[in-house]
Structures are given as C-alpha cells and as structure tokens.
Amino acid sequence: MSLSIGEKAPDFSVNDQDGKPVRLSALQGKKVVLYFYPKDMTPGCTVEACNLRDNYKLLIKQGYEVLGISTDNEKTHQKFIAKENLPFRLLSDTDKQVHNLYGTWVEKSMYGRKYMGTARNTFVIDEKGIIEDIIEKVDTKNHTDQILRKGQANVASPAAKKVAAKKTVTKQPASKKAKSKR
C-alpha cells in the first residue's frame, strides 16, 4: 500500500513493549511521530532512537507523541528501552500487519541478495489523524530535525543549533602584510 501526505493514516492496534494495546485512533487530538525501523539494538536503529531520545522534550513541547515500531517482540523492545533509556513506547508488529498497511515491509537487496525487510520510514500524523509528512530518506543522526523541519523552520534541536552556529562562523580576513619599504 502506498500512502500519501493528506490521506487519513490507517488505524491499527498493536501492543507496546509492556503488552498494552496501542490504537492509533485513540491518539487523535495529539500529533504522532510513527517511525518504522528495522531492528532493536542495531547500529543505525540505535542512533535513530537515541536522536529521538535526546530531543524528546523538544518533540513533546511541539505536541508530538513518539512511537517506534518494528517487527521485534515485546521482550526485545523492553531490553532496547532499558539499554538506551528510551522515554517513548515501542510497538511490536511481529505479524507485519501495520508494516503492510503503511507500505514499509518491502523487498530489499544487499550484495545482490533479495530479501524482505523494513523500510526506515517515518509518518508524521496530525491531531485529526491525517498524514502531515512522510520521511522516506531518514537521516538517523538528525531525525528530529527532519521531523521538525516541515513548516517549522524556527524550531531546531540543540545539536542542529550547534551545527548551525559552526556554519555561521565567518573567517577573519587574513592580516595585511606589512607594506615593504620603498
């Protein structure tokens, strides 16, 4: 299934890391960041989750509820949350139903071998349950900034502000050589 910005986000109900059901439609009235990632405790997924963790207060301040979703089970999610001190819920989609609804269970290729896996995509869903943004080329180190960039150019994470500050430093002109004697 291919989804588009402006469409109603497909509703679903899956368990979080504690076995508690999470239904997307029950979150109406809140903005939701629904990020699909391949696997708990792998390098890229850890970088992405930690970027969201480090900027969680900023995301909450902007009104977002963050939900990660993978095909991992609840026990693996619990370990990942404990190890990385993640403040948001991780959803278990072991049967891949939500992945299929959102078009994130896809054929991939590595070293010429084809296999099925999770496309690292994020869906930003507004308070009415409408898809506001789809991020298909996720930058795991700067994911929060990708989420906030859409329509909110004045909001940036602390890491982005540091990068911006470094970029705005201007070089001082080279000192003029002393005039040689005539």
Residue ranges and their predicted role:
Residues M1-R182:
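Chalcogenol-based redox active-site neighborhoods
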